[in-house]
Curated annotation (Swiss-Prot):
The keyword Nucleotide-binding applies. This is Glutamate--cysteine ligase. It comes from the Bacteria. Keywords: ATP-binding, Glutathione biosynthesis, Ligase, Nucleotide-binding. GO terms for molecular function: ATP binding; glutamate-cysteine ligase activity; metal ion binding. It catalyses: L-cysteine + L-glutamate + ATP = gamma-L-glutamyl-L-cysteine + ADP + phosphate + H(+). Transmembrane segments: none annotated. One of its GO terms (cellular component) is cytosol.
Length: 535
């Protein structure tokens, strides 16, 4: 590889973190994974059964819950220092789930199985408490606004943080007027700006949804090609149709594109969106003709989490606290990377080698210079991302950098060269060579697009002469066999079962003891809570 010059700031920060007394800080980064997956029948139909009680209460179980649908599971690992332990934790949650799923399977890819009519796609249910009802009505609102089909897409969310001591160390050598908390938030927002610039690379390397079931787009205009079988649509050079404009799209959110110049402007833009009426939603109202709730409010966003983005600044919330309240009160604690497809060739949907690379990539985004995004840069970042998810493997594809065209492979190779010193530093801190190895694996994909997961999905479908559903079912069955033949130890199984039992008891206690407030009043108070925040 050609030797690319690193920025002065990146060099200085790497030298500081690489000092003997500071290197251990890189061992204290935290990694957490959330993996969504649909429950399906043995014949690849959406499971119509309720969330299995043996998995615990979705409202209160911290590791096994539901996302949009009663049939859409979400597995959540704790945030751990060693990513190998994070992946192992995710593996164990899968094994526990399979011990309780009977004949059902976990769907292997991000794009959903053939879905029933919308009325037969069950919304996740969280019981009779006011917070449980709020979560249910919020999901009814999502169905009203975007349709249920879109909400059945699954993904991997990757949570990453640097230790606070690392931010404090970096602050000492830099001219920053605010306090330690402000510097940390400022730095995470800078990370997010760089992520916006470079996240197209993750889509090329890890996108794994080049094809989908034709029913997903029923009644919608599209430019996909029919191939493999009558029920499969695809794009020949696509990396991630999940992250394309075929996935989540919203006219209401079209003008809501924070460019992450600082935490205040980010929280203000979201606060405005959850308080600003949007006429098409106003026309529908919050209740149907029978007086039943259909959405929490008629604003651009019902709640801040409705804003769909590839990465989010996050802060752990207290009970009853809203995400924006936590960010305003205590600043940014970590970032949540939300654009990763599930790899259908991997039982857990993500590998340790991928995790190692994401760590180095996100750390590069954190340590590299990050000027505020001008409007043309915001536009370029969005168009680059969209180009890669729809045709990232097209030979000779060009992206826009500084308003000039640049070959994808050239830019990708430059980025890997700049990420390499960070990978080396992570390896040095941990006494391994896995991060450098992960860089080599990614460079091979840049040199040969057939090695990318998206290309391998299409190659496997072609080799087996099968469409999207047959491929996905085959992978789902293979992963089910893996998990069912690798059960948890008796103690691990007992621990998960105890957690499930406790979660059911916690939900029952909440429903029995919560303050008697009618739901309309509860929703009103919840909405008012966001209007009272001051930065």
């Amino acid at each position: 590889m050609k030797d690319y010059t690193l920025s002065e700031l990146l060099n200085r920060r790497l030298a500081l973190l690489g000092e003997r007394n500071n290197l251990s800080l890189l061992e204290q980064c935290l990694h957490g994974i959330e993996r969504e997956c649909l429950r399906v029948t043995a014949t690849a139909e959406l499971a119509q059964t309720p969330h299995p009680q043996a998995l615990g209460a979705a409202l209160t179980n911290g590791q096994v819950t539901t996302d949009y649908s009663e049939s859409l599971l979400e597995f959540i690992t704790p945030a751990l220092k060693n990513p190998a332990e994070t992946i192992d934790s995710l593996d164990k949650i899968h094994r526990f789930a399979y011990s309780k799923l009977g004949d059902e399977l976990l769907w292997s890819p991000s794009m959903p199985c053939p879905l029933p009519d919308e009325e037969h796609t069950p919304i996740a249910y969280y019981g009779t408490s006011n917070i449980g009802k709020l979560k249910y009505v919020y999901r009814k609102g999502l169905a009203l606004r975007y349709g249920k089909t879109m909400q059945c897409i699954a993904g991997i969310h990757y949570n990453f943080s640097l230790p606070e001591d690392a931010w404090a160390l970096l602050k000492q050598t830099e001219d920053f007027a605010g306090d330690a908390r402000d510097y940390q938030s400022h730095s995470y927002i800078a990370l997010i700006r760089n992520f916006r610039r470079y996240s197209w690379l993750l889509m090329y390397l890890f996108g794994a949804s080049p094809a989908l079931d034709a029913g997903f787009l029923r009644g919608r205009k599209h430019q996909l090609e029919q191939h493999f079988d009558a029920d499969t649509l695809y794009l020949p050079y696509a990396t991630s149709l999940r992250m394309s404009d075929l996935g989540y799209q919203s006219d209401a959110q079209a003008d809501l594109t924070p460019c992450y110049n600082d935490l205040v402007s980010y929280t203000d833009s979201l606060r405005k969106a959850v308080a600003t009426p949007y006429k098409p939603y106003v026309d529908v109202g919050t209740h149907d003709q029978n007086g039943e709730w259909v959405q929490l409010n008629t604003n651009v966003l019902q709640i801040e989490n409705e804003y769909y983005s590839n990465i989010r600044p996050k802060r752990a919330t207290y009970s009853g606290e809203r995400p924006i309240q936590a960010l305003v009160a205590r600043g940014v604690q970590y970032v949540e990377v939300r654009c990763l497809d599930i790899n259908p060739f991997l039982p857990t949907g993500i590998s340790l080698e991928q995790s190692r690379f994401i760590d180095a990539f996100v750390l590069y985004c954190a340590l590299e210079e990050s000027q505020q995004l001008a409007s043309h840069e915001c536009s370029n970042a969005s168009s680059n991302f969209l180009a890669v998810v729809k045709e990232g493997r097209r030979p000779g594809l060009s992206l826009q950098r500084n308003n000039s065209p640049v070959d994808l492979k050239t830019w990708a190779t430059e980025l890997l060269e700049k990420i390499t010193p960070i990978a080396r530093l992570l390896d040095q801190a941990q006494g391994i060579d896995e991060h450098i190895k992960s860089i080599a694996v990614q460079q091979a994909k840049i040199d040969d697009a057939s090695l990318t997961p998206s290309a391998q999905v299409l190659a496997s479908m072609k080799a087996h002469n099968e469409g999207f559903t047959a491929f996905s079912l085959r992978q789902s069955q293979a992963h089910a066999e893996y998990f069912r033949t690798h059960p948890l130890s008796a103690q691990e199984q007992a621990d998960f079962e105890a957690q499930a039992k406790t979660s059911i008891e916690e939900q029952a206690e909440l429903e029995a003891t919560e303050e008697v407030v009618d739901f309309d009043t509860f929703v009103g108070s919840y909405q008012a809570s966001i209007l009272s925040i001051s930065n």
